[in-house]
């Protein structure tokens, strides 16, 4: 039986996996979400010796069950290849009291590569499957990492255009240059005068604009998304949680069946939601620890059941988590409400019109899986320094948020369960923050800090940032948030 993906806002809006990948977002504003979970044979005595590609085949074939085995092999083998700098793809590193799952070994040194390396293959395969003649326009808002990873994946892919919006003053210099120097005739990068929430809200509006959709269709164009709102982004992230567990079994750190906690630095809620889905297919998960920075709207939600975006937006040293409207939480809300699309739509409407909602009647067992805490800027910097002093290992600021939150959780609960930290970016993506935290040196440029980071860590400067300082800047457009749609129409000649 083919797995059904339903809009979180309309029970009658159902599609297959390949259709969901092509559409990106549901036309009613909801997110396509599984209403049942596939059966996956998680026999870790066998899986522990499997390659990353083999684990990917096991998980993806269950969730994307309208793709053939041959189609999935094509997608997997083209995605997880020499673009990654280690055959392990996502190695697990043992530190003092925790395990860091390194998700930054792809071409843009951030965890988004794990899914965005395969999404273009999913999308072009799905387009062929459905005889799609329209050009696919990938429309994406980024808080720093998705934009570059999406462009790296889709650059010069036939039948696609990609347009990325980012907050002009809301990303690191390295992140910005990674985007603005991107090559590819089909890539377009636009800075906005506003924050990530402004960018994401306007992208959603464009997806839901009926008149714009009709204009696109008349020109043989169709929007899709590379954000984690697209199920094709989310499902590949389930793979690395299963793979991490298999590595723990293989190394003898745990016995198959032992529960493991995962601590995930969280902004748009996609990464931790993938861990939740891993639990639903049988991964022995104890707690999912949701780690936030000073934009702690999710921490408050899990503690009070009230989601309130009416608060100051703070620019932090972990910019990929500087988000007040966490889009993927909608999928968890849908599950918490027993997959009730009417109730979910009501709450999302309340968030849009009143800036908040309260969760009242919900599945307590699901919520019980989650713990939540946040780390301040000072705590994040202190954690980078502590981990370096303890393990001679440098974490990026997002990973350090998760690491600091895990230590808070452990102190509060005494929970001794083995815990994996999702290490979501290389410190080379945020060199100034890392070097300042470790050495106390201030006032360095990003490129001075890159050299210092190499000296301190002994880790080679990754190709993703090596030479970035002298790379030609190709994308120089900045627009007001209100002018985003006009910019899209101009690029597409509408």
For each predicted feature, which ranges?
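PLP-dependent amino-acid enzyme catalytic core
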Residues: 1-494
């Amino acid at each position: 039986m083919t797995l059904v993906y339903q809009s979180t806002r309309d029970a009658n809006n159902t599609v297959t996996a390949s259709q969901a990948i092509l559409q990106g977002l549901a036309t009613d504003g909801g997110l396509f979400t599984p209403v049942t979970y596939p059966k996956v044979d998680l026999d870790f005595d066998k899986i522990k010796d499997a390659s990353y590609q083999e684990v990917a085949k096991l998980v993806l074939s269950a969730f994307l069950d309208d793709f053939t085995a041959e189609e999935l092999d094509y997608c997997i083998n083209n995605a997880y290849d020499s673009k990654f700098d280690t055959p392990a793809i996502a190695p697990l590193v043992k530190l003092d009291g925790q395990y860091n799952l390194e998700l930054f070994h792809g071409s843009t040194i951030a965890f988004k590569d794990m899914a965005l390396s395969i999404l273009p293959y999913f999308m072009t395969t799905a387009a062929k499957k459905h005889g799609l003649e329209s050009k696919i326009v990938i429309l994406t808002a980024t808080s720093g990492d998705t934009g570059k990873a999406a462009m790296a994946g889709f650059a010069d892919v036939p039948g696609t255009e990609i347009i990325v919006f980012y907050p002009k003053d809301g990303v690191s210099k390295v992140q910005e240059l990674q985007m603005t120097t991107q090559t590819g005739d089909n890539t377009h990068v636009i800075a906005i005068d506003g924050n990530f929430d402004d960018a994401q809200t306007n992208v959603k509006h464009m997806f839901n604009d009926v008149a714009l959709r009709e204009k696109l269709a008349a020109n043989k164009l169709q929007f899709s998304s590379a954000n984690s709102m697209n199920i094709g982004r989310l499902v590949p992230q389930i793979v690395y949680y299963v793979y991490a567990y298999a590595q723990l079994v293989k190394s003898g750190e745990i016995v198959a069946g032992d529960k493991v906690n995962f601590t995930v630095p969280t902004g748009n809620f996609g990464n931790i939601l993938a861990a939740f889905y891993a639990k639903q297919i049988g991964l022995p998960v104890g707690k999912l620890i949701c780690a936030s920075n000073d934009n702690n709207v999710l921490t408050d939600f899990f503690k009070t059941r009230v989601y309130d975006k009416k608060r100051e937006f703070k620019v932090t040293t972990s910019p990929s988590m500087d988000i007040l409207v966490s889009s993927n939480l909608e999928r968890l809300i849908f599950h918490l409400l027993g997959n009730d699309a009417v109730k979910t739509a009501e709450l999302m409407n309340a968030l849009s019109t009143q800036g908040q909602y309260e969760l009242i009647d919900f599945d307590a067992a699901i919520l019980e899986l989650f713990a939540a805490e946040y780390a301040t800027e000072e705590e994040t910097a202190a954690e980078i320094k502590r981990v370096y002093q303890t393990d001679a290992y440098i974490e990026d600021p997002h990973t350090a948020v998760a690491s600091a939150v895990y230590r808070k959780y452990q102190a509060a609960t005494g929970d001794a369960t083995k815990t994996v930290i999702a290490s979501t970016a290389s410190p080379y993506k945020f060199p100034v923050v890392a070097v300042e935290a470790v050495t106390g040196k201030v006032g360095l440029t990003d490129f001075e800090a890159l050299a210092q980071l190499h000296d301190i860590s002994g880790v080679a400067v990754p190709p993703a940032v090596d030479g970035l300082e002298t790379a030609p800047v190709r994308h120089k457009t900045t627009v007001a948030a209100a002018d985003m749609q006009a910019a899209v129409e101009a690029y597409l000649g509408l």
